[in-house]
Amino acid sequence: MRKRSVIAAVIATGTLAALAATPAQAAESGYALKLRGVQYDAPGADSTHCTTGNTTGEYLTIKNYSASATVNLKGYVVKDAAGHSFTFTANHYLQPGDFVKLRGGKGTDSDANNVVYRGACDFLWNNDRDTAYLTTPSGKTADSHAYTKSGSDADGNGYIPFHG
């Protein structure tokens, strides 16, 4: 009996170590929309000034991985670990294989340029660590990823890919 407990503890420890070593943890689901990656650290010195700041350099890419279904982002919510959130309030359709960059700062949303601005001159993603969540209009988690700067960003450029 003791031998089984020791073996179970060793297996559990090995599993936890493997999970801790994974660069960006993903909560996989059957949803077509996935978080493709995050530019969590905007290039340059962080500044939240609306006209001269660099909040537009911070973005989250959402991609439609479906082979055939078009998805409307209206009602989807993006949030971080602290609960700061952005809700897509307008129609924004993603064709199969298409993506959108949800950028910080203010700008003009464009289906043609695949960009939606949060309309806020603050940063959403923490530079040291955070978790990005994408939830459906009904409140179910479509995708989520946790990252740490030291464990997930091997080249130190402030961008972490989640899905190819």
Where are these regions (language model features)?
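Solvent-exposed coil/turn segments that connect beta secondary-structure elements
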Residues: 65-67, 81-83, 105-107, 137
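Bacterial N-terminal signal peptides
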Residues: 10-18
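Short beta-strand and strand-turn-strand segments in soluble, beta-rich domains
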Residues: 78-90
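Short conserved beta-strand and strand-loop elements enriched in small hydrophobics
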Residues: 76-79, 132-134
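Solvent-exposed beta-edge/loop recognition patches
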Residues: 27-35, 45-47, 90-164
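Compositionally biased, intrinsically disordered/low-complexity regions enriched for serine, proline
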Residues: 20-23, 158
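A structural motif detector for short, solvent-exposed N-terminal "entry" segments of globular domains
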Residues: 2-10, 22-74, 123-126, 150-152, ...
